[in-house]
């Protein structure tokens, strides 16, 4: 059997996986393959590294049915995987997703279902440093705290319902330019997705209009710079999460049909931790995403006089000061 090809990129990913053990030796890995340059580069790298790591590899292509050529795209991926000796499944959406968010949720659910059926423990995606930078900037422009700005961690649990499945992103040290060069170096076939040029999608406008401007006029390595910022924030958010968890346990208790917050204990903590604890309480009761303004309504009650209260939050709950406590409770009918 001929030896797999080797390059600086192979060595980089191999070293990275030894330092950051995203894919343990011998584990089962479902690789998400769209056919674009990032996922093709990822699959080729994992196939070439497989003799060193002894992974069990499967490829999965998710067909949203959004484009007239989606069936051709799926066939392209299936043929590519067959030529590389990788078992491949094509999953077609029974109901076409209507938004990018819906499509993303469906993809991960489909990947998780296949992984569980096959006995895989990991799902690998081709996200790069460029994706990480775009996600950070996108979340910043929409309005986000540090949780949103950490953007695409190296690994995460797929979902609380599937705790045994881990999503990993082995290419976060590479940019989109790096994966393009890798595909060119090894003459890898790549499927060109026509929707990537559609400027009705916000992320495409960032990719095609905003980032080129930032690279020309501010920083030619802006994607790497923002990705590094996301990496720093990821570590800091992990610390904040731990501190928040400890403070939450000391200051928040369920009581009958309400949640009670101990003001004096929480007030002694830094404002950043107060906000995170109060946001976590609101996430338990609100039917809409918790905005900055929602959180600040609770923050204002930390020093408010007795019997002060908020307007109802989405979902019908309101907060009221009761001596040294804040009680979050359903709004009484009438």
Region roles according to the model:
Residues 1-208:
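Core alpha/beta nucleotide-donor-binding catalytic domains of modification enzymes
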Residues 2-38, 58, 62-64, 93-95, ...:
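AMP-forming adenylation/ATP pyrophosphatase catalytic core
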Residues 53, 121, 221, 285-289:
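Secondary-structure boundary/capping positions in well-ordered alpha/beta enzyme cores
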Residues 75-85, 108-117, 144-150, 221, ...:
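A short, terminal or domain-edge coil/loop segment
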Residues 173-245, 249:
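Contiguous mid-protein beta-loop-alpha structural module that forms a pocket-lining wall or clamp
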């Amino acid at each position: 059997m001929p030896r797999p090809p080797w390059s600086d990129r192979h060595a980089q990913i191999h070293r990275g996986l030894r330092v950051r053990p995203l894919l343990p030796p011998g584990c089962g890995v479902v690789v998400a393959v769209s056919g674009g340059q990032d996922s093709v580069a990822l699959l080729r790298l994992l196939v070439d590294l497989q003799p060193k790591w002894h992974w069990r590899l499967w490829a999965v292509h998710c067909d949203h049915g959004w484009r007239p050529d989606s069936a051709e795209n799926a066939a392209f991926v299936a043929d590519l995987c067959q030529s590389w000796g990788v078992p491949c499944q094509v999953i077609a959406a029974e109901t076409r997703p209507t938004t990018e968010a819906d499509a993303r949720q469906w993809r991960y659910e489909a990947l998780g279902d296949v992984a569980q059926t096959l006995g895989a423990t990991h799902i690998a995606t081709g996200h790069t440093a460029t994706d990480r930078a775009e996600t950070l900037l996108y979340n910043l422009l929409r309005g986000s705290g540090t949780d949103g700005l950490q953007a695409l961690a190296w690994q995460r649990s797929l979902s609380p319902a599937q705790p045994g499945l881990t999503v990993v992103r082995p290419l976060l040290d590479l940019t989109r330019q790096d994966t393009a060069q890798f595909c060119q170096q090894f003459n890898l076939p790549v499927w060109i997705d026509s929707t990537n040029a559609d400027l009705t999608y916000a992320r495409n406008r960032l990719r095609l209009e905003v980032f080129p401007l930032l690279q020309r006029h501010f920083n030619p390595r802006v994607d790497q710079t923002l990705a590094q910022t996301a990496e720093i924030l990821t570590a800091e958010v992990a610390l904040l999460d731990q501190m928040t968890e400890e403070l939450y346990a000391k200051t928040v208790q369920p009581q009958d049909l309400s949640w009670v917050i101990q003001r004096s204990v929480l007030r002694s903590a830094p404002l950043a931790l107060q906000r995170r604890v109060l946001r976590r309480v609101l996430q338990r009761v609100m039917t809409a995403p918790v905005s900055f303004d929602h959180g600040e309504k609770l923050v204002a009650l930390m020093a408010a006089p007795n019997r002060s209260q908020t307007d109802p939050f989405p979902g019908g709950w309101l907060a009221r000061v009761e001596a040294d406590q804040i009680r979050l409770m359903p709004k009484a009918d009438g």
